[in-house]
């Protein structure tokens, strides 16, 4: 196809002077002048030589360069596709590793939280037991102190009651009756 195109172009180029002369518009193409014919012949010879030089030497080299370039581009595109596939695979693996690490860390955090809660429960239970024991001890001490205080108040209450009754009624009241009344009041209260 290239050769056909080149031959058609050469034929058109060769017919150009004749067409121009037929129209009478180009005096430099006047074939009645002997120099014009020689110039056209040399031009045709140069064109044929140029055609063969281009067809046999330059165009195959240019075609080789174009073919090499096409092969290089195809190779580069294939390399780029492989690199893209490897990069996508690496990104998928990275995302999977990140997801696994996230799940693992969330599991570790949950375990740590549960362990801390369990320790807090144990410490709370131990503290509650200790506080309950201290409260029971304090209540026992308070009860003992109250009994001691009430026990210490009984003789004072007897003496005060005896003195008051003696002043109120003017005579001494029997100590057994005062003891009985103080005992009855201390047990009620």
Swiss-Prot record:
Pfam families: ATP-synt_B. It is a single-pass membrane protein. It is found in: Cell inner membrane. One of its GO terms (cellular component) is proton-transporting ATP synthase complex. GO terms for molecular function: proton-transporting ATP synthase activity, rotational mechanism; proton-transporting ATPase activity, rotational mechanism. The chain crosses the membrane at residues 4-24. It comes from the Bacteria. Keywords: ATP synthesis, Cell inner membrane, Cell membrane, CF(0), Hydrogen ion transport, Ion transport, Membrane, Transmembrane, Transmembrane helix, Transport. Signal peptide: none annotated. F(1)F(0) ATP synthase produces ATP from ADP in the presence of a proton or sodium gradient. F-type ATPases consist of two structural domains, F(1) containing the extramembraneous catalytic core and F(0) containing the membrane proton channel, linked together by a central stalk and a peripheral stalk. During catalysis, ATP synthesis in the catalytic domain of F(1) is coupled via a rotary mechanism of the central stalk subunits to proton translocation. Component of the F(0) channel, it forms part of the peripheral stalk, linking F(1) to F(0). Belongs to the ATPase B chain family. HAMAP family: ATP_synth_b_bprime. F-type ATPases have 2 components, F(1) - the catalytic core - and F(0) - the membrane proton channel. F(1) has five subunits: alpha(3), beta(3), gamma(1), delta(1), epsilon(1). F(0) has three main subunits: a(1), b(2) and c(10-14). The alpha and beta chains form an alternating ring which encloses part of the gamma chain. F(1) is attached to F(0) by a central stalk formed by the gamma and epsilon chains, while a peripheral stalk is formed by the delta and b chains. This is ATP synthase subunit b 2. The gene is atpF2.
